[in-house]
Design a protein with these regions (language model features):
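Histidine-acidic metal/acid-base catalytic patches
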Residues: 2-46, 51-65, 136, 194-212, ...
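Mid-chain, structured segments of secreted extracytoplasmic proteins
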Residues: 87, 91-118
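Active-site acidic/histidine proton-transfer and metal-coordination neighborhood
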Residues: 17-19, 23-26, 110-213
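Short amphipathic alpha-helices and their capping/turn segments at secondary-structure boundaries
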Residues: 56-57, 80-95, 124-135, 165-172, ...
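Glycine-rich, proline-tolerant flexible connector loops at the mouths of alpha/beta enzymes
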Residues: 70-92, 144-151
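N-terminal small/glycine-rich loop or linker at the start of catalytic domains
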Residues: 36-39, 100-111, 146-151
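Active-site-proximal loop/turn and secondary-structure-junction residues that shape catalytic pockets
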Residues: 51-55, 71-73, 104-107, 146-148, ...
Length: 302
């Protein structure tokens, strides 16, 4: 029978984990530096998948560079601090970076409307950003469409002012912890506020903090017929990207969508950040394998 492991002291854990996460940050930097040469005919990006971290080993074997996890599962899990500590141990063991996070906060924490929860949101943001830094991560995606949906009959200008006020308080937290917040425009079927890159940039310009930037989700752009030219127009703000097919949010390769117009725009602006598959899955293993091949091929063709 295996002997039980000796419990690791908090000091020992922090010492061991810090070294591991520093190594992953360096690996991230090297991958980003080598993946795209502006003078090369072949365009490539670090690819990841929005999924749970237990899939990290599989993603690594397939050629993916990172996992994109969930704030509510990885950084602030329902099971509490003990589960977060286990998540960090898994991160150290697999050594596959968690570059970014989705599901920042739930829809019942409202950023706009008559009943605000700004203080609770800021407390959650501070904890999530601190832990993201501990994990060597670069971004937290600020989508949370339910939270920012404007209630029927509520003044839109007032809602926008409320949201900007919250973001102006949140951006210094991102700066303090050294983790970028990426505002994510969502298609109109998911929320009625911040539906385009232009609308996202309005918020970013009002906040005016370099740690508060823009998420470019090609799926949402496709759903609302948003032109790839918008990527070029707002290139200075884009820090991270997502992708899925238009009709059913399937993985690239399931229905055969052509993403090359959007990839050309990313290449034109010399984008070198991450690109994550955020999809609905039927056969995860098969679809991430095919998705990697399709995205890599289409990137190389632009």
């Amino acid at each position: 029978m295996d002997q039980p492991e000796k419990p690791t002291s908090r000091r020992e854990f922090i010492k061991q984990a810090t070294g591991a996460f520093a190594g992953m940050a360096l690996a991230n930097t090297l991958a980003q530096a080598t993946v795209f040469n502006a003078h090369s005919a072949v365009y490539a990006l670090p690819l990841g998948v929005c999924t749970t971290y237990d899939k990290a080993g599989l993603l690594k074997r397939l050629g993916y560079s990172f996992v994109e996890e969930s704030v509510g599962k990885f950084l602030i899990p329902d099971a509490g601090d003990e589960q977060y500590a286990k998540n960090r141990l898994a991160l150290k063991a697999e050594a596959v970076p968690v570059r970014s996070y989705i599901y920042f906060f739930p829809g019942n924490l409202k950023s706009v409307g008559p009943d605000l929860h700004h203080e609770a949101i800021l407390q959650r943001a501070d904890l999530a950003l601190r832990r993201a830094k501990e994990c060597g991560s670069q971004n937290i995606v600020f989508g949370s469409g339910g939270s920012r949906s404007i209630p029927d009959g509520f003044d839109r200008a007032k809602a926008k002012a409320q949201h900007i006020e919250l973001c102006q308080k949140m951006a210094p937290l991102a700066e303090k912890h050294g983790v970028t917040l990426a505002v994510e425009p969502l298609n109109r079927s998911e929320t009625n506020f911040i539906n385009s890159l232009a609308e996202g940039v309005e918020i970013i310009q009002a906040v005016n903090n370099p740690w508060f930037k823009l998420q470019c989700d090609i799926y949402h752009m496709l759903k609302d017929d948003e032109s790839p030219d918008e990527i070029v127009k707002y290139s200075d703000y884009i820090t991270h990207c997502h992708i899925a097919e238009k009709r059913n949010r399937t993985a690239p390769g399931v229905e055969g969508d052509d993403f090359k117009p959007y990839f050309r725009a990313l290449k034109k602006i010399k984008y070198q950040g991450g690109l994550s598959l955020e999809c609905r899955w039927k056969d995860f293993d098969q679809e991430i394998t095919r998705g990697f091949e399709v995205v890599k091929k289409q990137l190389a063709e632009v």
